[in-house]
Amino acid sequence: MYTRYNYLQFDFSSITEPGIYMLEYGDQRTAPFPIATDVFQKAWFPTLDVFFPVQMDHMFVREAYRVWHGAAHLDDALQAPVNRIHWDGWRQGPTTGNKYKPLEHIPGLNVGGWFDAGDFDIQTGSQHAVVQVFALLWESFGVNRDETTINQKTRYTEIHVPDGKPDVLQQIEHGVLQLVAQVNAIGYAIPGINESHLYQYRHLGDAVNKTDNLVYNPRLDSLQTDGRTSGTPDDRWAFTNRTPHMNYGTAISLAAASRALKDYNPELSKEALRVARFIWDDEHNHQANPEEQTYSGRFSNPEFMKSIECRAAFELWRSTDYEGYKTKMNELLPTLLEQFNRNASVIAQMIPFMDNAFKKQVRPLVEAYAGELAEVDKENPYGVRISTAGWAGNRNIVQACITNYLLHRSYPELINPEYIYRGLNYLYGCHPCHNLSFVSGVGAQPKKVAYGSNRADFSFIPGGVVPGIRILKPDFPENREDYPFLWSENELSLIHISEPTRP
């Protein structure tokens, strides 16, 4: 029994022949589903081929006869006003933290990046997650799938039209352009860029229509334009509170990306590594003030800061072979290991580059982690941790799948691959409430209604992943299929797909 319901399990061990099957119990019958050795082989295609291209900010995105959106936010961005609490939870402190005055245009931010979710903001933490997971994907598997044309010079993306370049590398490039632009323009990584007016935050439809794409010029009247600038203050705001964890997150992402881009875009690869090293040096020479601690929130505790600094040292060491980074990494490793569950994925990524003594040191921690995975079987019939928080928990399930794969790679005798497949099975339909796949466009019965940029049409974006099941008090599992506007259940977000090391 789980929540208020009794569940039955079917033993598939007697099924040895590939084919199309259904399950039936009483008057309940599932949709037809395949059993084969290659069922997951193409399951990730829509996410790379469609979802990520659609989420690309500052680009015109076409799919055959359909235009998903124009090249939006070319007027990015104005420095956010000070002492401002934004309706979406963003904050700007009592100072800008840089040379720009409130509502002054910050040049160079109108490049790269992805819409974070169903709305149209750029959250830098999400950009970190995407760049890191794509860099990991490239270095682990060399994925050279090419189904998309992406031209940064013309700001043009066309879905299902190959251009002879690996899409993974082109997406890494797109994320790096935004992260590098932030540091070059402002001097450090920023929390992100968001709408300046509430009517824009509620905007449904083509993102290109949210602003006039002309940089705000306060010397012009409200509807006046000189062709390059306008007097309409509809530009997005850059929130610029400086925090160490955001800086280190950008350094981690750029250092990893520099390796992936080395042959594809050597110039950008060098620039990414230069900026990553600049951030490292700047953080070690910068005296943090109380304001920075305030806006770091839960990320300001010493243990977390040591762990993220260790991760930055690791990526920089891998990209440069500089012993100074390795020395700092070794100094901080004990803190990383003390928080094993939080840092399991990055520790697993370190193992192939460390000596056997480190692998032996980590082994008992992996054994304990494997024991905790076994205990999850007692919590529910699905063998994954189902969130009981206000926001549904597919993000954590995706993160667990990635972590379990990385640990299985080094400790196959300890981490059963079943712990990877359970998470995938859950995402593709084996979960409470209904048996729809939480990945739009993928699975026997995929989600057809989601909180994406096309939610007004009660539609979806192929390859997007929704948050999933929410447990309503006292014990009702829910995921609405008839109403896309519940973002805690149905919002298509970057973090539900790309969670390798994000805290």
Summary of predicted features, one role per range:
Residues 38-62, 171-187, 273-291, 318-341, ...:
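Long, well-ordered core segments of solenoidal/helical folds
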Residues 132-142, 252-262, 311-318, 348-353, ...:
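Short glycine/serine- and small hydrophobic-enriched flexible loop segments
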Residues 1-37:
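Ligand-binding face of N-terminal immunoglobulin V-set domains in extracellular IgSF glycoproteins
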Residues 51-126, 141-257, 264-281, 285-301, ...:
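Extended ligand-binding groove/face enriched in aromatic
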Residues 495-503:
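Residue-level detector of conserved catalytic or cofactor/ligand-binding positions
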Residues 56-95, 108-114, 331-494:
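Non-catalytic carbohydrate-binding regions of carbohydrate-active enzymes
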